[in-house]
Design a protein with these regions (language model features):
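Short N-terminal segments immediately surrounding and downstream of signal-peptide cleavage
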Residues: 21-35, 40
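Bacterial Sec-dependent N-terminal signal peptides
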Residues: 1-22
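Short, hydrophobic/aromatic-rich segments at coil-to-beta transitions
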Residues: 20-23, 48-51, 121-128
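Short polybasic amphipathic segments
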Residues: 21-26, 50-54, 660-665, 697
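Surface-exposed loop/edge segments in extracytoplasmic proteins
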Residues: 30-34, 59-60, 668-676
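A composition-driven surface/loop motif
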Residues: 77-749
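Residue-level hotspots within well-ordered secondary structure
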Residues: 37, 64-67
């Protein structure tokens, strides 16, 4: 068809048309070239080119036949508005320049093209086509320009494929359906295969493949903005993208580099859409990085894989904010100890790291650190971490280890799913973490931790499955699901903490005022596994269920040796809510216990010396409901005589089986408590607001309870409510009358 068209053109030219006609060569729907037929001496065709010979010119305009979509004629005036640079292998590039008299000067020597533009027209369009293994484009422009890349393939073994100076914003439009490629050479004196000193904008839906042999794939002292297109850095000796700022709203970026994938210098990064994939294998590199500035991610899909030591997937010195997006990061690089002071300073592989704050409002994060990433961190901030929404999953298998710190002291590090040097606040969203390495931490803060608000209810599922490891002497690094130097406040949420060692620990205090909270701290090591541990523990609301292999509740300053009765003035206070505890001891305070409201439901061990409730100071029951069953340890004491609510301390010589019940009622048959213990027990602490002075009560072991449920919805054991007790099959163990004056009533049977 095209051959017939060319014959037809030749016939028309040979006859010399009476009317003035213009011939137009089209490319990709555009008018690429036009000339009056009256000045065309001839059009010839060889293997590669259509050769246009104009009157008075000794040379021909050679246009590759493959880039001419069609030739048409018109009697209308044709205004060409686009510049074409067509690379022809080792032949001179074809230049079609309708602005040659308006300040645009273009020269070509083989595939080396130089453009100097002083034109006063914004965004002149340069269409780049063809192939050259020895080509380049160098341009100086005083105004922004647009480059349409239409199956452009340039390799420059001695410099950048494209180098633009002038500090202007330039747009690279990747023509739909095209595949373009740029490659530089090792002898280049520039930093990028595509290099500019101004902002770069990518548009279009075509593909651009880049090889950065010398250094970076794309390098600019301005911003890189990806609005669309598929950009693939196949390889880079250093960074894939190296810029001062990065923006992305659509398109696809795929980077394999020796250095960082995207290095935005000290300027901001904003990602609202598109897809980013990066594969990095070197040590101490970053997937997405800015220096002193911020990173904001509100959309898009990001997949980052880093295998080098101490690498970071997303890294900034400023704030990192997530308002959307789907982020996946996989890291496997080891920790690195750098000599400093009198020892070493460790650095770890980290999925998200900032020297400032991290704010997560929305989005999905899936962060994985392999077992080779010892000491690795999922999310780490030198300042605060605030999670208001989104779905976060961190899987961390890195082990901990000992090292000599910069002060010359033996120290240790361990992996952590989420860690901050200041405060952690989780007010919404879903957070799931698994830390399986030795000494691994789930949530860790050197400041305070707040979970939930009055209206914000997050979902937490925090798990540690690793073992403790010895640091020195009797000092171990313990796995902990939630640990803070400052106060921990649980206000709301559906929160589950599962640990093979410690559950919740604060050096200051733990306060629970709401939420549904489950803590399981189960260790195979004797004496290990604290459920909730802090000097001050306050429960004022919510539903909390604690199961521990050692102490369920441990109020301590850590200054009192085990087995002693010294009061360190620590506190366990219950003023509201429901707390259900099973442990060995269930409740242990090296100081005082005060109950003024709510429910305390506890089961201790069967065998002494551990107890259901162990305290060194006072145990005041001034309100609320208390039911606790434990061993017959000689150390077990009744509540303090300063209690203001009547209570019972019941000491049975016979064991109550965990399959049985203890039931207490008044002479009218009104139920005071019906309790099924988790373990076989002997001694009980009982108090409810309905318990009265100078009143006769009956105590039964056994019997049956129909209907109803356990307070707090516990499973298998607890305080019954809402059903009916029957003495059938039960044994009346004691009938007695409470004191007319004292609130503490001790009975043995």
């Amino acid at each position: 068809m095209k051959k017939h068209l060319y014959i037809f053109i030749a016939m028309l030219l040979s006859f010399g048309l009476k009317a003035q006609q213009n011939i137009i060569a089209h490319n990709s729907g555009n008018n690429m070239y036009s000339s009056s037929t009256s000045v065309i001496d001839s059009i010839k065709f060889d293997t590669n080119y259509s050769k246009f010979k104009l009157s008075g010119n000794s040379t021909t305009l050679d246009i590759q036949k493959t880039v001419i979509d069609s030739l048409t004629f018109t009697s209308n005036t044709v205004n060409l508005t686009k510049i074409y640079i067509i690379y022809n292998g080792t032949d001179n590039a074809t230049i079609i320049n309708p602005y040659s008299t308006q300040g645009v000067n273009i020269t070509a020597s083989g595939g080396t093209v130089n453009v100097v533009s002083t034109a006063t027209i914004n965004n002149l369009e340069y269409n780049l086509l063809g192939t050259s293994a020895t080509g380049s484009l160098t341009m100086s422009s005083t105004l922004p320009a647009t480059f349409v890349m239409n199956n452009l393939n340039i390799t420059n073994t001695s410099g950048p494929a494209i180098n633009i100076i002038g500090g202007q914003t330039h747009t690279f439009n990747l023509q739909a359906g095209t595949i373009n490629s740029l490659t530089d050479g090792s002898s280049s004196t520039k930093n990028g295969t595509l290099q500019t000193d101004g902002k770069i904008i990518f548009t279009g839906t075509g593909t651009l493949n880049i090889k950065g042999i010398k250094k970076h794939g794309i390098s600019t002292s301005g911003i890189i903005e990806v609005q669309n297109g598929s950009i693939k850095v196949i390889s880079a000796a250093s960074d894939g993208f190296h810029s001062e700022g990065y923006m992305m709203s659509n398109g696809t970026v795929n980077i394999t580099a020796t250095g960082d994938a995207i290095d935005a210098g000290d300027a901001a990064i904003s990602i609202s859409g598109g897809n980013i994939t990066a594969t990095l294998a070197s040590a101490d590199v970053k997937g997405i990085k800015t220096g002193t500035n911020t990173i904001s991610i509100s959309g898009g899909t990001i997949n980052l894989a880093l295998t080098g030591a101490q690498s970071k997937a997303i890294n900034a010195k400023g704030n990192i904010t997530f308002d959307g997006g789907n982020i996946t990061a996989n890291l496997s690089g080891a920790a690195v100890l750098t000599a400093s002071g009198s020892g070493y300073d460790p650095s770890y592989s980290t999925a998200i790291k900032t020297d400032a704050n991290i704010i997560l409002n929305a989005g999905t994060l899936n962060l994985t650190l392999a077992s080779t990433a010892n000491g690795g961190k999922g999310i780490s901030a030198d300042q605060n971490i605030t999670i208001n929404g989104g779905t976060i999953t961190v899987t961390n298998a890195g082990n901990g280890a000992t090292y000599t710190n910069i002060s010359g002291t033996l120290d240790s590090y361990s992996s952590a799913a989420i860690t901050t040097d200041l405060n952690l606040a989780i007010t919404g969203g879903s957070v799931t973490t698994t830390s399986s390495g030795t000494g691994g931490k789930g949530l860790k803060a050197d400041g305070t931790v707040t979970i939930g608000t009055a209206t914000g209810s997050p979902t937490l599922n925090i798990k540690t499955t690793g073992a403790r490891f010895l640091v020195s002497g009797t000092d171990y690094s313990h796995p902990k699901t939630l640990v803070a130097t400052g106060a921990i406040s649980i206000v709301n949420g559906n929160n589950t903490f599962n640990s093979t060692d410690d559950g919740i620990h604060s050096d200051t205090s733990v306060s629970i005022s709401g939420g549904t909270n489950t803590v399981n701290a189960i260790s195979t090591v004797i004496g290990v596994g604290e459920g909730i541990e802090a000097p001050i523990i306050n429960v004022s609301g919510g539903l909390t269920n604690v199961t521990a292999s050692n102490d369920g509740i441990n109020a301590t300053y850590g200054t009192v040796s085990g087995g002693t009765e010294q009061n360190d003035n620590s506190q366990f206070n219950v003023s509201g809510g429901i707390i259900i505890v099973a442990g060995n001891d269930a409740v242990d305070s090296n100081g005082n216990i005060t109950i003024t409201g709510g429910y305390l439901i506890a089961t201790g061990p069967t065998s002494q010396p551990e107890e259901a409730i162990d305290f060194n100071g006072s145990f005041n029951i001034n309100g609320g409901t208390v039911i606790a069953g434990g061993s017959n340890a000689n150390m077990t004491k009744a509540a303090s005589t300063t209690s203001t609510q009547p209570n019972m301390f019941l000491k049975s010589s016979a064991q109550l089986a965990s399959t049985s019940l203890i039931h207490i009622e008044n002479t009218a048959g009104s139920e005071i408590v019906t309790f099924k213990p988790k373990n076989n027990v002997y001694y009980f602490h009982v108090s409810t607001p309905t318990l009265l002075k100078n009143t006769q009560y009956k105590v039964y072991f056994g019997g049956t309870y129909t209907g109803g449920s356990y307070v707090g919805g516990s499973t298998g054991w607890g305080l019954y409510t809402g059903g009916t007790y029957s003495t059938t099959g039960g044994t009346l163990k004691s009938t007695f009358t409470t004191s007319n004056t004292a609130n503490v009533n001790t009975q043995s049977f």
